């Protein structure tokens, strides 16, 4: 059986090698960096923190979470170790997947993280929001849902698996006290949903440019430049 937990951890490990640099526009141009270089966040990003058992994946602090992540990469903890957890396939209240006509599960979150690098690489097809949980006003077809997530930004990327589905990446800012630096964000929660989680939020930023930079070598590749932004940069060089 394919070990989707290992695949997710391996993808997360690959993503940690890069810094995704977004140039955003609304009223002014904003530049932010998105990093996933904190390995202890893996258990939260893919939902393992919500599993009450088995004990092998229980982690209550950063050191324990790093240890769990390392053991997954070493295949000392595999998906077979958690597949019988009653929480793994329990429906997440308020979510809805039009493809399966049912709510999402923690297992669905793990499967999504297998695709994390691809999602980030094509995130220019999505939108970036400043997130305010107090403005969350999510209404599904059959229930109301309040998203109580303490994030600073929300990156929303259309799914390639289902035209109704979006990939939601919640990000927190680690350098709020450094006003002279570009905003630095870290991914700490991610999941898919066909319910619109952006209702009530302010208008999104336009993604003007997306660059992927390898942290160790500083090599970078521009994944996308908005035509209008490209033109403005060309005019600035004249």
Please give the residue ranges for each predicted region.
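An acidic, glycine-rich, mixed-charge low-complexity segment common to nucleic-acid enzymes
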Residues: 1-153, 157-158, 226, 230-238
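Conserved binding-pocket/active-site segment within a compact domain
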Residues: 118-224
């Amino acid at each position: 059986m394919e070990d989707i937990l290992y695949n997710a951890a391996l993808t997360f490990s690959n993503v940690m090698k890069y810094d995704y640099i977004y140039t955003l526009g609304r009223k002014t141009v904003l530049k932010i960096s998105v990093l996933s270089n904190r390995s202890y966040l893996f258990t939260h990003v893919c939902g393992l923190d919500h599993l009450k058992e088995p004990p092998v994946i229980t982690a209550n602090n950063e050191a324990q979470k790093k240890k769990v992540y390392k053991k997954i990469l070493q295949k000392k903890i595999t998906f077979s170790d958690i597949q019988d957890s009653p929480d793994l396939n329990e429906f997440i209240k308020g979510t809805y997947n039009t493809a399966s006509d049912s709510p999402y599960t923690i297992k669905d979150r793990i499967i999504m993280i297998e695709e994390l690098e691809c999602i980030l690489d094509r995130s220019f097809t999505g939108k970036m929001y400043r997130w305010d949980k107090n403005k969350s006003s999510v209404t599904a077809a059959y229930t109301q849902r309040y998203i109580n997530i303490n994030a600073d930004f929300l990156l929303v990327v259309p799914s390639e698996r289902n035209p109704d589905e979006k990939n939601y990446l919640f990000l927190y800012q680690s350098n709020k006290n450094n006003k002279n630096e570009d905003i630095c964000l870290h991914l700490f929660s991610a999941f898919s949903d066909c319910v619109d989680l952006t209702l009530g939020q302010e208008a999104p930023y336009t993604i003007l440019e997306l660059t992927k930079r390898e942290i160790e070598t500083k090599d970078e590749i521009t994944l996308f430049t908005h035509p209008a932004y490209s033109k403005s940069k060309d005019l600035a060089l004249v």
